[in-house]
Amino acid sequence: YYVHGESISSYLSLQPREFVSAICILILVIEAVRLRTGIVVVGQREYESRQISALAWGALAVALALLIAPDGGKEGMQAGIYGAPIILGMTLVDPVMGEIKRAKQDLRAAVIAGMVISYSVWLGCHLWIGTDIIAAVLLAPLTVLGEIPSTKLIDDNATMILLPLGGLVLLLPFL
């Protein structure tokens, strides 16, 4: 999105933000049809036949992060000053924490590993693309917090993005 969004979206004569919205709406429409028919797509869990899938939750959350997170007036990857660590955090922290929770049945170990990875992502983005250090320090734990609650109402793919995104929105006036 940050590097090639302009060229990809231009194939459909759209701006990058319009393209993100259109793809998200398309995924949500397909998800509504899937739910109505009770189809379980390969890779989905059986219970997802009756509720919004992890894929749909994740797509919605990523789209919101791309649409809401400010770009700091920058271009290219530097425009991902906040969106990139939010999305990368979920992408890298979720599978590690999930596997540790499943294999070791140890939430504490999962949280510690998640914090190490999340801080690595956020502080790495501080060094790489200039993410504010205050945002990195305060928002990294929110990624991990998004993995902890076990609920069928909203998938952790969404909460791991929406919690730091919400924190960012509240923190922005101070940055």
Protein language model features and the residues they cover:
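Selective transmembrane alpha-helices of multi-pass membrane proteins
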Residues: 23-24
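Interhelical loop and helix-boundary elements at the membrane-water interface
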Residues: 1-20, 29-175
